[in-house]
Amino acid sequence: MKGRSGVLTYDNWNVMHMALTADLNPFAPIEGGNQEKFRSVAKSIFGGAKLLTDDLVAMNTALINGEIDAYFTGGTYTASPARFDGATQVRAITPNSGPVDGKGGVVWVELTSVVNNPDPSSLGEDFLEFVQAPDISKAVAFTEGTYNPVSQMGDAAVMSLFDADELDAIQMDSLEEEMSRSLDYQVVTSYDALIDIYTQERRS
């Protein structure tokens, strides 16, 4: 892969995935020799990269044009725009195995909730009702720029609003399998030390 890969420079995500690549749990303390394992992986990934950018459109374009064969890291949220435009050869892939209970990916689920403020507004609950309506749920899933599954798709009234191309764009066919191979997002315990190492290797 040397010279045939890219790094999508979403640094916080890359720190987690580089830890997993180094056979480490990103959500447990990483110290001493394990930090050197992390450094070695960061050095290898950055050293072999042809392209570094924080522009997912540029990265997908390089993939489609054959300039690179893969990029580190991404997911449904980065692959879906290209897939929806017809480039279905672009696909987010979760490792088959990994160092934490056999899992090698990370997933996060965003929730909208009402916060228990001392002086709550009734508008919060109105908003929750609004965003869970089928048409708004669909609009949230396909907000321009990146497309993602939403939990409301468990409701048949929401799911029925998606056509086959939209479901294919967000890789609905493999969602359950990808989720089963992924850790839930947590706080990266040693983030300060790891981002420092990451930044050093990115600049070298």
Protein language model annotation of sequence segments:
Residues M1-V7:
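A conserved helix-loop-strand patch within extracytoplasmic ligand-binding domains
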Residues V7-Y10, N14-M18, P26-T94:
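Ligand-binding pocket segment of bilobal, Venus flytrap-like solute-binding proteins
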Residues L8, T21, V115:
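Residue-level recognition of the GNAT/N-acetyltransferase active site
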Residues D23-I30, P118-G124:
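Short helix-loop capping/hinge motifs at secondary-structure junctions, enriched
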Residues A62, G66, P81-D85, N117, ...:
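Structured segments of extracytoplasmic/periplasmic soluble domains
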Residues T88-V106, V115-N117:
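Short beta-strand->loop
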Residues E110-E178:
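Mature extracytoplasmic/periplasmic domains
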Residues L167-S204:
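Conserved C-terminal helix/tail region of periplasmic/extracytoplasmic solute-binding proteins
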